Design a protein with these regions (language model features):
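A short, N-terminal "cap"/entry segment at the start of jelly-roll beta-barrel domains
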Residues: 1-23, 31-34, 66-70, 109-114
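Double-stranded beta-helix
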Residues: 3, 85-114
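Short, well-structured hydrophobic secondary-structure segments
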Residues: 24-40, 44
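A generic "binding-loop/recognition-motif" signal
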Residues: 30, 39-40, 80, 88, ...
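Short acidic-glycine-tyrosine-enriched beta hairpin
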Residues: 57-79
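Glycine- and acidic-residue-biased ligand/ion/polar-headgroup-sensing regions
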Residues: 39-58
């Protein structure tokens, strides 16, 4: 389902207890609200267009501005205020996830030729 926003529109693709995946269409010279997520990482992958990501740290003010073009990916850590600005009309994929342990696998046997 697509939802209209002042900066374009967002479409929810998938979500579960630890991940959300959205497709966003953003407009040139429009921005989302400055906001933060307490526990979620927020990733942006630009498929087409140009997107500026701004990140703030409470005690330091604006600490980063990253320009993403087609094929670029950037991550905002939990607890950091951020916003995006469309520098050129485009499409991006937005991911939200919680940190997990990559080495949590427990193998019962080894893979190989059968």
């Amino acid at each position: 389902m697509k939802a209209g926003k002042c900066w374009g529109q967002t479409e929810f693709i998938h979500g579960n207890g630890v991940l959300e995946f959205h497709r966003i269409e953003f407009k040139k010279d429009h921005r989302c609200s400055k906001h933060m997520h307490r526990t979620k990482y927020n990733g942006f992958y630009v498929e087409e267009g140009k997107l500026l990501i701004r990140v703030w740290q409470d005690d330091q003010g604006l600490i980063d501005e990253t320009i993403l073009q087609e094929g670029d990916f950037s991550v905002v850590s939990p607890g950091k205020y951020h916003e995006f600005v469309g520098l050129r009309d485009g499409v991006a994929f937005e991911l939200y996830w919680a940190q997990f342990n990559h080495s949590d696998i427990v193998r019962e046997n080894s893979g190989g030729k059968v």
